[in-house]
Amino acid sequence: MKRHIGVACLVTCVTAASALAQDVRITQELDKVSVNLNGANVVIERNQNQATRLSSEFTKTSRPCPPFCIQPMSLAPGVQTFGELEVISFLQSEVQDGSGLLIDTRLPEWFEKGSIPGAVNLPFSTLEADNPFRDEILRALGASDSTGSWDFSGVFTLTLFCNGPWCAQTAIAVSALLEVGFPPEKLNFYRGGMQNWLLLGLTTTNSAG
């Protein structure tokens, strides 16, 4: 009897260890990251429930093009394209030390449904030339026009994203910034956007504790 109990305990322990070994990690070496955002500690990790399926707008495979056309991997010379690991690294470095901003270029109603932790909502349309408040926005991004022309030497590094590879909002925002003289080396494009972020089960503002 004791032998049977011992075998049962061994099987239970091995099963439990196997379950722990199957945790959904960010990378093989990284299970989660902790980032201090505006004085609050936020943990970014992946959803551990392996039965989870998307059930939102992001389950669609097909949308009319235009306007929902597939975006290129590269938006413009000098503008880097990021994946999820680069976005996480950007949060850990530039956003955390105050030299960078993660920009959600979607409209406010989409931002309020959930975004990437640490993101600032700056709708793409606010960067267009006909917006009377655009100059104020550029100043908030670190630009200066005290000499009568724009000086972008002190701007934040920006990583911009929208709904996903089928969403043109970030492309429009980047184009508007480049047109006014924003340096391309200060711009990063997270092409996967919320579609890929959610697909990988990464923490959002709706799930961050």
Question: Residue spans of the language-model regions?
Answer:
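Flexible, polar/low-complexity N-terminal or interdomain linker segments that lie immediately upstream
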Residues: 20-113
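Bacterial N-terminal signal peptides
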Residues: 8-16
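Catalytic cysteine-centered active loop of the rhodanese-like fold, especially the PTP/DSP P-loop
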Residues: 140-195
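Mid-length scaffold segments of soluble, non-membrane domains
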Residues: 88-156
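Solvent-exposed loop/turn segments at secondary-structure junctions
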Residues: 107-111, 126-129, 164-168, 193-197
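Bacterial N-terminal signal peptides that target proteins for export
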Residues: 1-9
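Short, solvent-exposed loop/turn and secondary-structure capping segments
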Residues: 113-117, 134, 170-174, 200-201
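Active-site neighborhoods of enzymes that stabilize oxyanions during catalysis
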Residues: 200-209
